């Protein structure tokens, strides 16, 4: 998601998205470890999305 889209969400929605993204990153790491992940750049995308969400949550505080 883009930062502009994330800024439109409430803090509760952002926290929900954060948990979802963290779970997705966890799953991607498992798939990478078992050599089932074809697109390894998706791990970086997930990390960047998590960072964006955390940054926007801090801005809203």
Curated annotation (Swiss-Prot):
Keyword set includes Transmembrane helix: no
Gene3D superfamilies: 1.10.287.310
SUPFAM superfamilies linked: Ribosomal protein L29 (L29p)
Domain of life: Bacteria
InterPro entries in UniProt: Ribosomal_protein_uL29 (IPR050063), Ribosomal_uL29 (IPR001854), Ribosomal_uL29_CS (IPR018254), Ribosomal_uL29_sf (IPR036049)
One GO process term, biological-process aspect: translation
Presence of the UniProt keyword Disulfide bond in the record: no
Molecular-function GO term, any one: structural constituent of ribosome
Keywords: Ribonucleoprotein, Ribosomal protein
Listed Pfam families: Ribosomal_L29 (PF00831)
GO CC field: cytosolic large ribosomal subunit
Family under the similarity heading: Belongs to the universal ribosomal protein uL29 family.
PANTHER family xrefs: 60S RIBOSOMAL PROTEIN L35/50S RIBOSOMAL PROTEIN L29, LARGE RIBOSOMAL SUBUNIT PROTEIN UL29C
The protein's name: Large ribosomal subunit protein uL29
Taxonomic lineage from the root: Bacteria, Pseudomonadati, Thermodesulfobacteriota, Desulfovibrionia, Desulfovibrionales
GN (gene name): rpmC
């Amino acid at each position: 998601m883009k930062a502009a889209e994330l800024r439109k969400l409430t803090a509760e929605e952002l926290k929900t998205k954060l948990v979802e993204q963290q779970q997705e990153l966890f799953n991607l790491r498992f798939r990478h470890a078992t050599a089932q992940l074809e697109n390894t750049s998706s791990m970086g995308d997930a990390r960047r999305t998590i960072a964006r969400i955390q940054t926007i949550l801090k801005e809203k505080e």
